Curated annotation (Swiss-Prot):
Domain notes: Has a bi-lobal structure. Contains two similar globular domains separated by a deep cleft wherein the ligand-binding site is located.
Signal peptide boundaries: 1-22
Alphabetized Gene3D superfamilies for the sequence: Periplasmic binding protein-like II
The keyword Signal is assigned to this record: yes
Source lineage: Bacteria, Pseudomonadati, Pseudomonadota, Gammaproteobacteria, Enterobacterales
Protein name from the UniProt record: Histidine-binding periplasmic protein
GN (gene name): hisJ
GO biological process, alphabetically ordered: L-histidine import across plasma membrane
GO cellular component: ATP-binding cassette (ABC) transporter complex, substrate-binding subunit-containing; membrane; outer membrane-bounded periplasmic space
Assembly, per entry: The complex is composed of two ATP-binding proteins (HisP), two transmembrane proteins (HisM and HisQ) and a solute-binding protein (HisJ).
Family that this chain belongs to: Belongs to the bacterial solute-binding protein 3 family.
Keyword Cell membrane: no
Length: 260
């Protein structure tokens, strides 16, 4: 009887482990908008590169699955995830209350503050008084767009939405908008530290609103994909513990991108 109970226990344990493994797809289709350097963009060979891309590849390796990247505009990523056209989102996606009503997230991958970028000779600050009558560029589907439309647009500030962060910077340098509003790190590394951004600066301090901007960024998943989320969280915790996360981050940043 003891042998029978032991054998049955082993079978149940194996079946449970097998079921959990089977719940993780052999190939994960990861949606991304490759216009947001240094997190996701394309190099001169047309290859996807960036911190998010490196993180996703490492996470997929650790959970023993293949990852395929699917390019989409940011505002199409959540609808694509819910429609099962993709299995995950890795695109500097802030973890916000509103988004958590629609999808699930992994644990925080890194911090995300939002700031204005303006010309060096500009005195624009992120206040209603300073921005009134100005045109502010934002990326469609971002928390910055939501904040601008809720807090600034009703006060006489024109919020101009774009598909593709590069289009925002192009209009900023051409003088068609007065400021660009985006993630602080993306603006610093992807624009201000590049030759094209030499005549620009941050306009004032970061804009704080935990309800809209969330508590950091994560990988977006469907709510029902609990096993996948747990596996990714475990793999990410291991990356943080063994130094892999820090090694990848140092390729792109000279500061603690994870934050407090």
């Amino acid at each position: 009887m003891k042998k029978l109970v032991l054998s049955l226990s082993l079978v149940l344990a194996f079946s449970s482990a097998t079921a959990a493994f089977a719940a993780i797809p052999q190939n994960i289709r990861i949606g991304t908008d490759p216009t947001y350097a240094p997190f996701e963009s394309k190099n001169s060979q047309g290859e996807l590169v960036g911190f998010d891309i490196d993180l996703a590849k490492e996470l997929c390796k650790r959970i023993n699955t293949q990852c395929t990247f699917v390019e989409n505009p940011l505002d199409a990523l959540i609808p694509s995830l819910k429609a099962k056209k993709i299995d995950a989102i890795m695109s500097s996606l802030s973890i916000t209350e509103k988004r958590q009503q629609e999808i699930a997230f992994t644990d925080k991958l890194y911090a995300a503050d939002s700031r204005l970028v303006v010309a060096k000779n500009s005195d624009i600050q992120p206040t209603v008084e300073s921005l009134k009558g100005k045109r502010v560029g934002v990326l469609q589907g971002t928390t910055q767009e939501t904040f601008g439309n809720e807090h600034w647009a009703p006060k006489g500030i024109e919020i101009v939405s774009y598909q593709g962060q590069d289009n925002i910077y192009s209009d900023l340098t051409a003088g068609r908008i007065d400021a660009a509003f985006q993630d602080e790190v993306a603006a610093s590394e992807g624009f201000l530290k590049q030759p094209v951004g030499k005549d620009y600066k941050f306009g004032g301090p970061s804009v704080k609103d935990e309800k809209l901007f969330g508590v950091g960024t994560g990988m977006g998943l469907r709510k029902e994909d609990n096993e996948l989320r747990e596996a990714l969280n475990k793999a990410f915790a291991e990356m943080r513990a063994d130094g892999t996360y820090e090694k990848l981050a140092k390729k792109y940043f000279d500061f603690d991108v994870y934050g407090g």
